[in-house]
A protein has these predicted regions:
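Short beta-strand elements that form the blades of beta-propeller/WD-repeat-like
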Residues: 123-136, 140-141, 162-174, 179-180, ...
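Solenoidal tandem-repeat scaffolds enriched in leucines and small polar residues
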Residues: 218-312, 317-318
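Aromatic (tryptophan-biased) beta-strands that constitute blades/sheets of beta-rich domains
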Residues: 103-122, 144-157, 187-193, 231-233, ...
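Short loop/turn segments that connect beta-strands within beta-propeller blades
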Residues: 144-146, 183-186, 223-228, 276-279, ...
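Repeated scaffold domains used in trafficking and secretory/extracellular systems
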Residues: 116-127, 155-167, 195-206, 239-248, ...
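Intrinsically disordered, low-complexity segments enriched in Gly and acidic/Ser/Thr residues
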Residues: 323-417
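N-terminal targeting leaders characterized by basic, low-complexity, disordered sequences
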Residues: 1-58
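Hydrophobic membrane-insertion alpha-helices, especially the h-region
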Residues: 81-97
């Protein structure tokens, strides 16, 4: 019975178990559908999120690109604006330069004036900016741009003559015996020569060449700054001729002398070159070159620098060049009468009377470089008593009138001055000049 009851019980429970299994299978299918739906919904959400992220990224990228474009446009605008400003500034600068170049000034403003009563014998030597020497028979004084005394040396001379090379100055008593050497810092040396001094030249390091007279004998000697004789050259005026002029190179190693004499009742001139280095030590009196010129006079000879020299003839100029033994390199022939010559270490000029029918001006000025190539020629009418070149400017003046040319040939300034002009010196500052008059030292600014 128990067994039968157990079987009946199991038989009754079996459909329940099957029903539960059927119910479990139904639940799993729904769950699967639910899971699939959830998965699809989740995927769609993920897709929407991804799309949103990509859209946001694209929007951010567009914003970055837009910002980059705006920055680039701003930079371009800045560049264009800067270029425009620079172009305007350049145009203004070029225009001012052209205006300044072509304009001729006829007016001046008096900047300052200082009295110099009783000082008419003083000569002014402009050495460099901020250093001017005042030389008279009683000594030499150096003043700065404010005219304050930097140093002074006293002496007594009857007729002081001056030669300048760079910032080295030789002051000698013409027809006397005293020689003083200065630079911008003060006295370098002084000594006495044994015969009557007629000419003196100085090199940068203080070496001095002097022409001395002793009856019918001329001595052309070279000294160091302390008076020690480097070369002693005795010449006979009757044989060699009279030394018209001489110069020493800036390095003190070469000397050029112009002689004039009469040979067979004919005027004879010659130019002698001396070398005091090892090149000329084995030559008689260190003479390394001699050139004769018949029928002409050579009143001036100059070293432009250590290698170039020029001989001013009465009918032109001859340019020499050579490191040790100068040779003739170029000859300039002037057909008209030479009125004046001027020079510095870089340029030399010749002024002649002008007789050209097509040009009615009275004078013709020609400027040349040290090698003889021409810089310019210009014509003018002003009567002048002094001419000199200083830096890149040429000064012509008389007692009441001043004219300034540039070395490019431009007339820069031409006007009368209210006082008598004794000397003109460049000053510090654009367009400023020192005008020395008999009773004042004036600083003017042209404009």
């Amino acid at each position: 019975m128990k067994l039968l009851d157990k079987l009946k019980k199991e038989k009754k429970e079996e459909p329940k178990i099957i029903k539960k299994q059927g119910e479990e299978q139904k639940f799993s299918f729904r769950d699967a559908l639910g899971n699939l739906k959830s998965a699809m919904l989740g995927k769609a959400a993920d897709i929407r999120e991804e799309y949103k992220n990509r859209t946001d990224h694209a929007m951010q990228s567009d914003e970055m690109q837009d910002l980059s474009v705006r920055l680039r446009l701003h930079k371009n605008k800045v560049r264009i604006r800067t270029a425009a400003i620079l172009t305007v500034l350049l145009a203004v600068s070029v225009g001012f330069g052209i205006y300044h170049h072509v304009r001729v000034y006829h007016h001046y403003v008096l900047v300052s004036s200082e009295e110099r009563a009783g000082d008419n014998a003083t000569q002014y030597i402009f050495l460099k900016k901020g250093c001017t020497l005042k030389c008279n028979p009683n000594g030499v004084t150096c003043v700065n741009r404010e005219n304050a005394v930097q140093w002074n040396t006293t002496f007594t001379m009857q007729n002081p003559v001056i030669d300048v090379c760079g910032t080295t100055v030789a002051v000698a008593d013409q027809r006397g015996n005293d020689v003083y050497i200065f630079n911008e810092k003060g006295l370098v040396g002084n000594f006495k020569v044994e015969y009557t001094l007629t000419r003196i030249r100085v090199a940068r390091q203080g070496v001095v060449a002097a022409v001395l007279e002793d009856g019918d004998v001329a001595w052309i000697n070279v000294y160091d700054s302390k008076g020690n004789i480097i070369v002693k050259n005795k010449t006979s005026i009757g044989k060699a001729g009279y030394p018209l002029d001489m110069d020493i190179s800036s390095d003190g190693l070469k000397m050029v002398v112009s002689f004039a004499g009469i040979q067979n009742k004919t005027l004879d001139s010659k130019v002698d070159f001396y070398n005091f280095s090892s090149v000329g030590k084995d030559q008689d009196n260190n003479l390394v070159k001699e050139i004769s010129y018949d029928g002409t006079v050579i009143p001036e000879v100059r070293f432009m620098d250590s290698d170039y020299a020029i001989a001013f003839r009465d009918d032109g100029a001859t340019i020499f060049c050579g490191k040790h033994v100068p040779e003739e390199k170029r000859e300039i022939t002037i057909e008209k009468e030479i009125v004046s010559t001027f020079y510095d270490e870089s340029y030399f000029g010749i002024i002649t009377e002008n007789e050209q029918e097509e040009n009615e001006h009275k004078y013709k000025m020609e400027l040349y470089r040290e090698n003889g190539s021409k810089c310019f020629q210009a014509y003018f009418d002003m009567e002048y008593t002094n001419i000199k070149i200083c830096g890149e400017e040429i000064f012509l003046y008389n007692g009441t009138e001043l004219m300034i040319y540039t070395t490019s040939g431009k007339l820069k300034y031409h006007a009368a001055y209210e006082k008598q002009i004794s000397e003109v010196i460049p000053s510090d500052g654009l367009g400023k000049y020192v005008i020395i008059t008999p009773d004042s030292v004036d600083i003017i600014k042209i404009g």
